[in-house]
């Protein structure tokens, strides 16, 4: 049984959390995030600690999810989130043209992508992409969209992958 909903969230100095109806806003040194939360779950703030209580066991899943989401928001406005990706394959390269990310990954045309608001894309080298921002959900979603342009294939391992991702390799046909 998960007890994540009962864990206390420590609010660091410089971060303010305000509740306005069903919306909770977190402001910090890196920016501001607002999210809608279930009205049935009550938020209690005592000094620099926040905890949540639920009315009954039917809200177990929502209880843990709300606590995890608020903790992700606090971490986002203080430290931020970052996904590092690399391109593996002959001729595969990435470049930044203005606000667009341009990927040449073996198609007959370059793939152009625009990062969502609040997400910054850096291309330190032609085979490396760094996606960063304050919202864990938006950063992860955009990284998944970039990866889906050319997901790593199991035979040669070519494609766009996360730096810490392990691609399971398959053996090719043996032939006669």
From Swiss-Prot:
Q: Which GO terms describe its cellular component?
A: cytosolic large ribosomal subunit
SUPFAM superfamilies found in the cross-reference section? Ribosomal protein L6
Mention one GO biological process in which this protein takes part, according to its record: cytoplasmic translation
Record bears the keyword DNA repair: no
What are the record keywords, sorted? Ribonucleoprotein, Ribosomal protein, RNA-binding, rRNA-binding
Recorded GO terms, molecular function?
A: rRNA binding; structural constituent of ribosome
The record describes the protein's role as: This protein binds to the 23S rRNA, and is important in its secondary structure. It is located near the subunit interface in the base of the L7/L12 stalk, and near the tRNA binding site of the peptidyltransferase center.
Q: HAMAP family, per this entry?
A: Ribosomal_uL6_B
UniProt record similarity statement: Belongs to the universal ribosomal protein uL6 family.
| UniProt xrefs under NCBIfam families | L6_bact
User: Could you tell me which PANTHER family the record lists for this protein?
Assistant: 60S/50S RIBOSOMAL PROTEIN L6/L9, LARGE RIBOSOMAL SUBUNIT PROTEIN UL6M
Q: What is this protein called?
A: Large ribosomal subunit protein uL6
